Amino acid sequence: MNIPNIAYKGNLAKNITAEDDYYQSIAYFKTIEDFIDESSYSRFVKAVENLVRTSTDYKAFIDYIKNTLGLDFCQVFSKVSDQYATVEFHHGPIFTLYDICEVELTKFIKTGQRINTFRVADSVLDLHFSMKINGVMLCKTSHEMFHNQDIFINVRQCIGDVNTYIKENSKYFNDEIKYKIWNYMHLCQNDSFDNGGLDIDTVKKYIKPIS
């Protein structure tokens, strides 16, 4: 099946060119120059985020959490189950899905990998299935309470090995993400009984404080 007026050119640059106008060409892979503009950078990360959320693999991951791990209930209000209310996977309490996609894009750039939304999204999904992404099951009420900072989510309530994720990806964190980690660590030490869920020594070793 052919897409009307579109011809795929299988060269190294991986360009898709309009048949009726050779000069109308869209590169299949992105270059570093494509991310110089902040708005273009943000649009790309959001596109990756959307691709992850809407993928069949992500739906399979959520199904695994609910039906294999048995986490089909709110981990704040444990009596609220998926049977009676919508219970969703919330990325956090430190890294949002946008953060994770952004870190993966930075990794692709710094390691010289070919970049497009599909490749970065695949890498993000691999992190989910390797259980390195921190997340917690929340109902609508607890989700709103978390975003309003009415409740504190402890990493011990979550699935995913956040300490390994930090150790393996810290060199790709920007200052905003580093600040999030240090701020959460401060809350753990001063406003909550973290009980070692977040490995403070790991954070201090791999993440320098933001001045």
Set out the residue ranges of the language-model regions.
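The −1 position to Zn-ligating cysteines in a subset of zinc-ribbon hairpins
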Residues: 73, 88, 138
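Short, non-ligating residues that shape and space the ligands of small metal-coordination modules
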Residues: 83-85, 145-148
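Cys/His-coordinated zinc-binding microdomains
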Residues: 77-79, 140-143
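A boundary/linker detector
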Residues: 1-83, 96, 172-211
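Short cysteine/histidine-rich metal-coordination sites, predominantly Zn2+-binding motifs
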Residues: 89-98, 154-164
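Histidine-centered nuclease catalytic patch
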Residues: 79-134
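Residue-level detector of alpha-helical secondary structure
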Residues: 163-170, 204
